[in-house]
Each structure stands twice: as structure tokens, then as C-alpha cells.
């Protein structure tokens, strides 16, 4: 049997998918702008 791949951790989630992580790189800012343009309610986790 294989283990479950989703092992939740708030810290890991924020560091990889959080708003400040997105703002830190040019591509991350692209992601945020794309989500703004699409009209997403939540921009990041």
C-alpha cells in the first residue's frame, strides 16, 4: 500500500503558495496578475 501524498502543513503551504512567495518572483507576480485579470476572489493561499 502506498502512503497518502497529501500531508497538510500550513507552513509549507504558505511558503510555496502564499501571497508573499508569489510576490517574490517575476513569474509569481505574473500568476497573481493573471488571477486578478480572471477575477478570482482568492489570489493565493
UniProtKB/Swiss-Prot annotation:
Source organism, top-level taxon: Bacteria
One annotated GO molecular function: structural constituent of ribosome
InterPro entries: Ribosomal_bL34, Ribosomal_bL34_CS
Biological processes annotated in GO: translation
GO cellular component: ribonucleoprotein complex; ribosome
Keywords for this protein: Ribonucleoprotein, Ribosomal protein
Annotated Pfam families: Ribosomal_L34 (PF00468)
Leader sequence residues: none
Family that this chain belongs to: Belongs to the bacterial ribosomal protein bL34 family.
Stored HAMAP family: Ribosomal_bL34
NCBIfam families cross-referenced by the UniProt entry: rpmH_bact
Protein name: Large ribosomal subunit protein bL34
Lineage: Bacteria, Pseudomonadati, Pseudomonadota, Gammaproteobacteria, Vibrionales
